[in-house]
């Protein structure tokens, strides 16, 4: 037994040594294969550094400096009546004191010269029963104070002219209001979102939340067990409350988390293509080393040792590629944060964006990189280990190659026919499956298509390359499996490009369609951020009344906001007036007529859900939806599914403004839409609106037509970024082409020597390699076009499952770009291998083994 183990250990060491020597002897191939892992790991690592850093910066900007032991908020983050919970909390033995505060973080125009700054307005009880405030200058708030504020010392960095006794303008729901500064805190506070303290009644008035709070602060008795106290407090509160979570801003957090998931999918796709490249490389390596493997088997190497040798090679490349990828990923993340920092602070005002390295990001990227390399190398390794010595020494016969190609054609065509049936004759739920099946069928059928494609384009190559084209075709069809896998790598990249092109076109059409349907007003009164209303100070009904009083105005429709939670997801709850709103805007309804739907909204607890909300909650029209609100559990009946341009990308629901006020205590208008009387002068009406908005600097007025065009153009510009992402996906495809051509040169070294020995010039050898690369590029581009069209059609139909009925537009420019890029990639990838082949020494090439 000991002897057997020693022999096994010695054999494993020998196989490891042979594998390492093989990698070191073929440096270019090893480097190209390793680069695929480097790229995928770097992309995933960078994404998992940048977006979590953004999440962390955002969450930090929400956190107030506090000496309280425990914070309590509603699960929705909305304000609630303190008398519903305060008496039961103060009765607990572990609670020394409790107080309510009302806070909101929002953008404050004019705090700095260049941009609006982010501040946190906090209304508190001046009694300081829970935490103490040290003042460095002036005094703190006192009982009965109104119209006064206390600022943090760090405010001097933003507005050095402020001093005790000066006045400061704050935006409120009732318009701009001046507050007198009575003191500065000793603490610097959060410099990215300074905390301004006012009395609780002043905050309730400023935020139009009379007699409400959104946070309870608790101080525990000395020596109380924090965990036990927290459990007791939660039990006392019941459902609808949470401990130590910042109030509000769930919409931005959700958007950042969705962005993290989407970009991770991009990184995984890049890593998948890298795995495809490694699989192709090791499959080719096994074919090239058939004689070496046969000799090793003949002198006693076991199947396990052969498999082990090739797996070790893939493991080494995976480890090296992962280490290099982590370094490059960190550099990419550092550059990304540097580029995003200015935009983050200028437009989001959500803290300072800085790069944070976390072990989970390292572990995820490293684990995926190493595991991907080993898994991709294992299948060729197992195939090599199962090869007998005689089988390895025997060259593949044309009959066996044709037999394998025949079966790949039958299975591949059958899979593609099934996918076409799913694409054409099923609903949106089966469309994505059909698209993926078509791609799978193309991958399976690819080896059988090598010869027909080579014959089809051979006359074209003959025109460009004369006799070299025939030699290139022969080289390609000699190993159809290798050519198919290489072309398939290119196919996936080009299909992704076509898919992106189709999605950009169709999504742009959807946005334009929704904009035309929804924006039927003449003037829009807009908050600083659209569709993310957590950090918006709206206006009380007085603003809408003042606008209605203008002689040019016919109707004013308003939008109000609240947040709600369900066991499945958080929801935006938007309040509209069922009578006024249809006169200034509408929805893209998925069934039913608008008049009856709006009528239902005005009676009882009925709601319109966006398609995203409906699919996320897995509900249907007519079902009941139970929401956790500041007033407890409320049940709403789903009256319809409707999308509008501002909320179709989020989980949102629309209810009447009466229900919003009763269930959520919200009566702020966060967006106003104005329709003018026929024949009114738009410019004059806008001027009148802007005069009124001088008292409400948190809003801006714009003509609806101009804003519609701006929104469509901004969306189109943002969608164009997806083309850049698709180009990134093509990098592994280019590496695959370069790798395959390089391996072909090494495998055919003696053959190239013979060509040179019988009179072939260096230029002819170079043209042979270029022609072969061009054939591979054309083959991959052709498959990419078919796969890309099928995938784009299927995935666009699949969006119907979440209610996005996007029209399919054939991506003509995407197809043309894919073909051109495929050919250019092939020609570019051929430069180095062609030069290497042309420079081979004839004598050494003939002696090569």
What are these regions (language model features)?
Residues 1-13, 17-21, 25-32, 261, ...:
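Alpha-helical transmembrane segments, especially those used as permease/efflux helices
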Residues 27-52, 257-294, 315-329, 367-375, ...:
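Hydrophobic alpha-helical transmembrane segments of multi-pass inner-membrane transport and secretion
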Residues 34-120, 164, 228-235, 483-572, ...:
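Hydrophobic, regular-secondary-structure patches
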Residues 47-48, 83, 91-92, 96-144, ...:
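The feature marks short, hydrophobic/small-residue-biased sequence motifs that occur predominantly
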Residues 57-58, 232-272, 287, 309, ...:
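Peri-transmembrane interface segments
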Residues 65, 180, 184-222, 518, ...:
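Small-residue transmembrane helix packing/gating motifs
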Residues 316-348, 360-386, 414-426, 447-458, ...:
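Small-residue-rich transmembrane alpha-helices
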């Amino acid at each position: 037994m000991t002897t057997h183990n020693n022999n096994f250990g010695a054999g494993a060491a020998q196989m490891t040594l042979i594998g390492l020597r093989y990698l070191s002897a073929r440096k270019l191939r090893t480097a190209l294969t390793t680069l695929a892992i480097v790229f995928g790991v770097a992309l995933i690592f960078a994404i998992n550094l940048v977006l979590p850093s953004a999440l962390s910066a955002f969450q930090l900007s929400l956190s107030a400096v506090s000496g309280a032991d425990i914070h309590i908020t509603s699960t929705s983050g909305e304000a609630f009546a303190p008398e519903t919970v305060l008496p039961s909390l103060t009765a607990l033995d572990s609670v020394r004191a409790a107080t309510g505060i009302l806070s909101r973080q929002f953008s404050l125009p004019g705090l700095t010269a260049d941009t609006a700054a982010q501040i946190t307005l906090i209304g508190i009880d001046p009694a300081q029963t829970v935490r103490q405030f040290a003042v460095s200058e002036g005094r703190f708030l006192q009982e009965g104070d109104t119209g006064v504020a206390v600022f943090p010392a760090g405010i001097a960095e933003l507005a050095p002219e402020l001093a005790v006794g000066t006045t400061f303008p704050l935006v409120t729901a009732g318009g701009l209001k001046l507050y007198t500064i009575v003191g500065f805190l000793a603490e610097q506070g959060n410099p990215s979102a300074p905390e301004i303290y006012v009395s609780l009644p002043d905050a309730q008035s400023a935020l139009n939340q009379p007699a409400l709070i959104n946070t309870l602060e608790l101080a525990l008795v000395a020596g109380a067990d924090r965990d036990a106290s927290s459990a007791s407090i939660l039990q006392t509160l019941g459902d609808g409350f949470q401990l130590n979570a910042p109030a509000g801003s769930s919409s931005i957090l959700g958007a950042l988390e969705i962005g993290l998931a989407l970009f991770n999918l991009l990184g995984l796709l890049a890593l998948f293509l890298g795995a495809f490249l490694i699989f192709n490389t090791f499959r080719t390596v096994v074919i090239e080393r058939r004689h070496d493997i046969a000799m090793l088997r003949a002198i006693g190497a076991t199947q396990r040792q052969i498999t082990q040798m090739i797996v070790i090679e893939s493991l080494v490349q995976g480890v090296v590629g992962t280490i290099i990828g982590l370094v490059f990923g960190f550099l990419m993340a550092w550059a990304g944060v540097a580029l995003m920092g200015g935009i983050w602070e200028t437009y989001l005002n959500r803290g300072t964006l800085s790069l944070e390295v976390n072990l989970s990001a390292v572990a995820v990227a490293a684990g995926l990189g190493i595991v991907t390399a080993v898994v991709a190398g294992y299948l060729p390794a197992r195939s090599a280990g199962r090869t007998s010595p005689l089988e390895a020494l025997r060259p593949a016969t044309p009959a066996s190659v044709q037999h394998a190609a025949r079966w790949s054609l039958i299975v591949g065509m059958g899979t593609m026919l099934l996918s076409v049936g799913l694409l054409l004759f099923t609903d949106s739920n089966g469309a994505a499956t059909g698209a993926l099946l078509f791609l799978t069928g193309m991958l399976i059928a690819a080896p059988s298509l090598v010869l027909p494609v080579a014959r089809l384009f051979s006359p074209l190559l003959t025109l460009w390359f004369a006799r070299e084209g025939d030699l290139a075709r022969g080289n390609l069809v000699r190993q159809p499996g290798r050519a198919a896998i290489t072309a398939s790598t290119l196919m996936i990249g080009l299909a992704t490009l076509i898919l992106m092109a189709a999605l950009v076109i169709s999504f742009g059409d959807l946005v334009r369609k929704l904009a035309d349907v929804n924006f039927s007003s003449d003037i829009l009164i807009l908050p600083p951020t659209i569709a993310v209303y957590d950090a918006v100070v709206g206006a009380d009904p007085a603003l809408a009344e003042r606008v209605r009083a203008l002689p040019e105005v016919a109707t004013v429709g308003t939008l109000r906001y609240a947040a709600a939670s369900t066991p499945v997801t958080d929801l935006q709850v938007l309040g509209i007036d069922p009578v006024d709103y249809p006169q200034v805007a509408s929805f893209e309804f998925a069934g039913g007529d608008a008049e009856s739907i709006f009528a239902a909204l005005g009676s009882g607890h009925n709601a319109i859900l966006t398609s995203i909300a409906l699919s996320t909650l897995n509900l249907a029209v007519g079902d009941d939806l139970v929401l956790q609100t500041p007033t407890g559990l409320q049940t709403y009946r789903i009256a319809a599914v409707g999308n509008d341009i501002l909320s179709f990308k989020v989980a949102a629901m629309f209810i009447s403004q009466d229900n919003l006020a009763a269930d959520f205590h919200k009566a702020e208008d966060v967006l106003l839409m104005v329709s003018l009387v026929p024949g009114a002068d738009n410019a004059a009406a806008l001027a009148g609106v802007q005069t009124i908005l001088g008292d409400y600097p948190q809003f801006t007025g714009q003509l609806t037509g101009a804003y519609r065009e701006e929104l469509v153009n901004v969306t189109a510009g943002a969608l164009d970024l997806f083309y850049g992402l698709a180009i990134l996906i093509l990098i592994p495809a280019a590496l695959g082409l370069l790798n395959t051509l390089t391996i072909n040169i090494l495998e055919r070294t003696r053959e190239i020597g013979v060509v040179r020995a019988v009179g072939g010039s260096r230029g002819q050898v170079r043209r042979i390699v270029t022609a072969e690369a061009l054939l591979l590029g054309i083959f991959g581009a052709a498959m990419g076009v078919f796969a890309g069209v099928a995938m784009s059609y299927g995935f666009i139909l699949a969006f119907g499952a979440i209610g996005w009925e996007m029209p399919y537009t054939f991506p003509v420019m995407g197809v043309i770009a894919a073909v051109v890029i495929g050919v250019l990639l092939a020609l570019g990838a051929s430069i180095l291998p062609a030069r290497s082949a042309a420079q081979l020494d004839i004598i050494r090439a003939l002696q090569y083994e």
